[in-house]
Amino acid sequence: TSKKSIPKPPSAAEMKAARKKWEASPDGIMVNKWKASPEGQKVLAGAAKIRNHISDSTNMEAVVTSLSLPPGSRLGFGVMVRINGDDYILSFGLEESNEFQQLHSLKVNDKIIIRSHFVSYAPKYSYPIVAGDYVERDSKIIYKRAPRKGGC
């Protein structure tokens, strides 16, 4: 049997150097300018407001505000929601085998309970992007993300 060499993960110093290099690239400069802009600050503040719910994967009350994502979105299936007065993209990804069937029954102004493990943002979007892991309406679960196959 041959032993494959497993590349060791980069050190903290290597990761820091790689980040500095990326920040100096055109993409890095654009992202940092966006983060400093009023629109970027608004998105980052919205993400920060729900960070504790995300890290603890606790329930968040949301209201569906739109059944479609902003024009040009490339996030798969999702809806727009309002959580504590701020708007968010609630994204579920690409649909495989009708797993989102019950989510298609959502209507504007529906009050839902959501849970997520991840919130992200990108200069292309004017709202933080919440990964939908769990959705409940009228005390009934209408979506629960299946655990990943093969671990984590």
Where are these regions (language model features)?
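Structural detector for short beta-strands of small beta-barrel domains
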Residues: S55-L75
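OB/S1-fold single-stranded nucleic-acid-binding modules
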Residues: T1-D56, G150-C152
